[in-house]
């Protein structure tokens, strides 16, 4: 079992819609910070096993 990591739901600005759009997958804060115009949705923190992240550092909260 790998170390736990905290992942968050987040939203990304969609220029065409003129609004932030929530993303289905969760990510660690460090990954979200690298995405242009993305912001963490407060209160969505979840601790998961690092092995549950995909190769891009994303976590699918739905089985």
Predicted regions and their residues:
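A short beta-strand micro-motif
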Residues: 6-14
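Acidic surface patches and DE-rich sequence motifs
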Residues: 14-15, 54
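A short, exposed loop/beta-hairpin motif centered on an aromatic-Gly-Thr core
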Residues: 17-30
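Short, mixed-charge low-complexity intrinsically disordered segments
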Residues: 31-63
């Amino acid at each position: 079992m790998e170390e736990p990591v905290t992942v968050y739901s987040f939203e990304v600005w969609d220029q065409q819609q003129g609004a932030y759009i929530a993303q289905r997958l969760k990510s660690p804060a460090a990954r979200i910070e690298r995405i242009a115009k993305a912001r963490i949705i407060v209160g969505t923190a979840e601790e998961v096993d690092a092995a549950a992240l995909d190769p891009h550092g994303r976590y699918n909260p739905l089985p």
